Amino acid sequence: MKLSKTCLSLFAALAGSLSGAQALAHDMVPGKAAEGPLLLTGLTIHTVTDGVKTDSDILIVDGKIAAVGQNLSAPQDATVLALDGKHLYPGLIALANQLGLIEIEAVRSTDDSREVTQTNPDIKAKVGYNADSEVIPTIRSNGFAYSMIYPDGSMLMGQSSLMQLDAWNYQDAVVTDGTGLHVRWPNASTLGSRWNPKPADEVRKANAEQLAKLQQYFQAAKAYYDAEQAGLNRGIDSRWHEMLAVFKGERPLFVHADDERQIRQAMLLAKEYNLKLTIVGGRDSWRLADELAAAKVAVIYTAP
C-alpha cells in the first residue's frame, strides 16, 4: 500500500501534536481517597498554632482532621498506619499566583491567564486551570497543597479560586470557587516607561483618566447592588452580579498595587464602599503600615 505525501504529512503533524501534548503533562496520579477513617500514629506533628507535638497521633475522618493527640483510639473500621518518627507538616497555601494558568510564558497557546478587556469581574480563574501542568509537581514537592490562582489583566481582572493540587481536572481541584475580586490599580507614577517615554503632564492625565474609569465601574456595580437589594433589577448583568458578594462583605477586594499613591487611592475606594481590602504586591506598604493596620487592610507582599 502506498501513502501519499499528504497522508505522511498529516501523520507527522499528528505525532508531533501528541508528543507536544505529552510534553506539557505530568505523570503523577491523584491519590485515592481513604475508605473509612485513617489513624496515623507515632508522628512528630508541626501544628500551625500549637507548636510541635511529639509521639502523637492524628485521626482523619471524611478527609478532615478529627482529632490530634497521644494514644488515640482507632474507630472500628479505621485503617491504622504506624509512622514512628515521621514528621507531619500542614500543607502550605500559595497565594495570588497563576499556577496552572500559564505553562510556558513564551508560548501564547499555553497562557490562559487573561482576557482582553478591562471589565471582567465575572471571569473565574478556575476555568483556565490545568490540573496536568508540569509545574504542579515541583510546587507540591516544596510543601504546597493549595494555590489561590487569579486571572491577570487590567483593571477588573476577575475572580480568584482556591485549588487543591492533587486533582484530575479543575472541577476536582476547586476548593473555593470565588475567593475574591482582583483589580489591577491604575498607574499613579508620573514617569513614562523607557519603552514609551512621555512628558509628565501626559502621564498624569492618562493616569487620571484610568482612575476615573475604574471609579465609574465601581459606581455602576454599586448601583446594580443597590437595585438588587431593593428588588428593582429587571435583568442580570453578569459583570456586576459577580461583584454583589464584594459589596456584601462576603468576599474581599484584592487590589494589585505597589506605589504608595496607588495603595492610598485603593484605601479611599474601599472606605467609600465599605469593602474588605487586601493589597497584593505592596512594595510601598511599609510606608503606611500603621494606616493599613488601623484600617484592617491585609497585605500579600509579592513585590521584589
Role assignments for model-derived ranges:
Residues 1-10:
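Bacterial N-terminal signal peptides that target proteins for export
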Residues 16-20:
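N-terminal signal peptide c-region/cleavage motif recognized by signal peptidases
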Residues 23-44:
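Short N-terminal segments immediately surrounding and downstream of signal-peptide cleavage
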Residues 30-32, 45, 49-89:
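Histidine-rich, glycine-flanked metal-binding segment
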Residues 86-142, 147-150:
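Metal-associated gating/positioning segment near the N- to mid-region
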Residues 142-277:
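Polyanionic/metal-chelating signatures
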Residues 270-276, 293-300:
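Glycine-enriched alpha-helix->loop->beta-strand junction motifs that scaffold or abut catalytic
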